[in-house]
Amino acid sequence: MVAYWRQAGLSYIRFSQICAKAVRDALKTEFKANAEKTSGSSIKIVKVSKKE
């Protein structure tokens, strides 16, 4: 059985992004500001130096 998001041609990441946006849009205004703050993504880049 194929997942319905896969049948629609979506990756799981895109599907979860759509779901998260729908949840944030449905929030009451008092909770929406906090949800919008945390909705961004962040990455950390670490350069590894080779020590001999």
Curated annotation (Swiss-Prot):
Which superkingdom, per the lineage?
Eukaryota
* One term under GO cellular component: mitochondrial inner membrane
- Give a yes or no for keyword Repeat in this entry: no
| Chain positions found as N6-acetyllysine | 21, 32, 37, 44
Question: Where is it located?
Answer: Mitochondrion; Mitochondrion inner membrane
Coiled-coil positions: none
Report the record's disulfide bonds: none
Identify the Gene3D superfamilies for this entry. ATP synthase, F1 complex, epsilon subunit superfamily, mitochondrial (1.10.1620.20)
Residues recorded as bearing N6-succinyllysine in the entry: 21, 32, 37
Q: What InterPro entries does UniProt report for this protein, alphabetically?
A: ATP_synth_F1_esu_mt, ATP_synth_F1_esu_sf_mt
Q: Which GO terms describe its molecular function?
A: P-type proton-exporting transporter activity; proton-transporting ATP synthase activity, rotational mechanism
Quaternary structure note: Component of the ATP synthase complex composed at least of ATP5F1A/subunit alpha, ATP5F1B/subunit beta, ATP5MC1/subunit c (homooctomer), MT-ATP6/subunit a, MT-ATP8/subunit 8, ATP5ME/subunit e, ATP5MF/subunit f, ATP5MG/subunit g, ATP5MK/subunit k, ATP5MJ/subunit j, ATP5F1C/subunit gamma, ATP5F1D/subunit delta, ATP5F1E/subunit epsilon, ATP5PF/subunit F6, ATP5PB/subunit b, ATP5PD/subunit d, ATP5PO/subunit OSCP.
Q: What's this protein's family per the entry?
A: Belongs to the eukaryotic ATPase epsilon family.
Q: What does this protein do?
A: Subunit epsilon, of the mitochondrial membrane ATP synthase complex (F(1)F(0) ATP synthase or Complex V) that produces ATP from ADP in the presence of a proton gradient across the membrane which is generated by electron transport complexes of the respiratory chain. ATP synthase complex consist of a soluble F(1) head domain - the catalytic core - and a membrane F(1) domain - the membrane proton channel. These two domains are linked by a central stalk rotating inside the F(1) region and a stationary peripheral stalk.
Protein name per its UniProtKB record: ATP synthase F(1) complex subunit epsilon, mitochondrial
Q: What organism, scientifically named, is this protein from?
A: Mus musculus
